[in-house]
Amino acid sequence: MTVNPITHYIGSFIDEFALSGITDAVVCPGSRSTPLAVLCAAHPDISVHVQIDERSAGFFALGLAKAKQRPVLLICTSGTAAANFYPAVVEAHYSRVPIIVLTADRPHELREVGAPQAINQHFLFGNFVKFFTDSALPEESPQMLRYIRTLASRAAGEAQKRPMGPVHVNVPLREPLMPDLSDEPFGRMRTGRHVSVKTGTQSVDRESLSDVAEMLAEAEKGMIVCGELHSDADKENIIALSKALQYPILADPLSNLRNGVHDKSTVIDAYDSFLKDDELKRKLRPDVVIRFGPMPVSKPVFLWLKDDPTIQQIVIDEDGGWRDPTQASAHMIHCNASVFAEEIMAGLTAATRSSEWLEKWQFVNGRFREHLQTISSEDVSFEGNLYRILQHLVPENSSLFVGNSMPIRDVDTFFEKQDRPFRIYSNRGANGIDGVVSSAMGVCEGTKAPVTLVIGDLSFYHDLNGLLAAKKLGIPLTVILVNNDGGGIFSFLPQASEKTHFEDLFGTPTGLDFKHAAALYGGTYSCPASWDEFKTAYAPQADKPGLHLIEIKTDRQSRVQLHRDMLNEAVREVKKQWEL
């Protein structure tokens, strides 16, 4: 009787992933991927999350890896199944999230000969993956078992090496595909990890930073801009640096510097609104900017930095690459944020720096927020109030996942700094509106804590399939559906002036009744008519297992003018108080 080599070959493959610290596999049903799926399910150190739809599965894995900050296996059968991972792989590439894609494939003799469910899977994801290989067909020799273990270690290491990102291993398999679980699939040839891949913090010596340190020591008018941050230590060190330099921090919501129990005295949270005013920009123009992480959501900040090349920009990016869409940076420094902050602070003199510059920013920010609160609309159709109310209701130590298009921009505008500890997530790599529901589900599974998802109606429609995870896994997900019946962001863009074709090409109303989606996936549903009703609907459900859908119906046309009028009035009041 011929021994099927799949059991020990794929068993060694999966076991080495577990030895590399991987604890989760997202698996899509399929025949050719049987040994990968079954041996993941049988491994005592790997949790399997079954997702039926491959596109949703890809984004679920993305959210899971984003929450855990370590690689997740993503497994599917051969054919178009793998192609459905493409959007999630692209997002993982640009947001630097480690995913290990394992695509089962037909053996070489069945490729390019018209065999069913066989497509060319070589380099399927192009340059969006950091590493690709087509593994050898299963053999049970000691040499081949060492080979497949080494390949697993390498794939895990490549995914975690900075900048982190997706990798792809194509796995050709011959029938029979069912492994023999009674034959010690993980024990044979387990003599320890054959390749131990370690990554560390990227550092830079003080001498290399001498010119930057000297510039910062002399520049009193500076500011710190923070994009998405992952490390609490980095946050604390950036705050310490801002206090030492007396620089304001323009904190993107994804920096998570606006929320939490840390010191927020130097954090500025209303900049996206008041930096739209040219006079305020002139009064608050810095000589130097230190930017940590990717470019923030705020378009006014981006345009300000892009259009004024005389501002000295210092970009700190530990992961390498070139994240500077302004094309105006003077210094690109590839080192850890905490290392940079500590080195700069160590070189500062003990002399007390003037706080006048920082106080200007604090004054404008404080007056703007105060005035905006006095003119807020009680109309439930005004979306801005949602975020000001929600930030005080999100359960502590839970997560807030924010959809792209208008939701993340409204969070940037209306989300104030406050002490409630929770984490904000969003898919800002490629900024797509697809896969957002599934990404939020993955974060929920990864954190083992409730998630509140704020999402627009078109984005919600894109990923309705993702809601199945809430029902199957009992995930505590509250979806706040901001339904303006179409693409609300286009009403703020020049396309809105094209009246003849605007609704058909850009507004794209669907007219869908989303309460049926809640029923389909066994969730609760409410559609509050006031903000008091919203609070009553949200608070009791936010940390309970299952799907809870709260629909906020808004009006695209009226919100544009109301939004602009409110912000313009607040800016006018600030300028009056500042005697501009």
UniProtKB/Swiss-Prot annotation:
EC id: 2.2.1.9
Enzyme type, top EC level: transferase
SUPFAM superfamilies, per the entry: DHS-like NAD/FAD-binding domain, Thiamin diphosphate-binding fold (THDP-binding)
Quaternary assembly: Homodimer.
UniProt family annotation: Belongs to the TPP enzyme family. MenD subfamily.
Cofactor binding annotation: Binds 1 thiamine pyrophosphate per subunit.
UniProt keyword terms in alphabetical order: Magnesium, Manganese, Menaquinone biosynthesis, Metal-binding, Thiamine pyrophosphate, Transferase
BP term (GO), one: menaquinone biosynthetic process
Record Pfam families: TPP_enzyme_C, TPP_enzyme_M_2, TPP_enzyme_N
Gene symbol of the encoding locus: menD
HAMAP family in alphabetical order: MenD (MF_01659)
Species this chain originates from: Bacillus subtilis (strain 168)
Protein name in UniProt: 2-succinyl-5-enolpyruvyl-6-hydroxy-3-cyclohexene-1-carboxylate synthase
Role according to the record: Catalyzes the thiamine diphosphate-dependent decarboxylation of 2-oxoglutarate and the subsequent addition of the resulting succinic semialdehyde-thiamine pyrophosphate anion to isochorismate to yield 2-succinyl-5-enolpyruvyl-6-hydroxy-3-cyclohexene-1-carboxylate (SEPHCHC).
Coiled-coil intervals: none
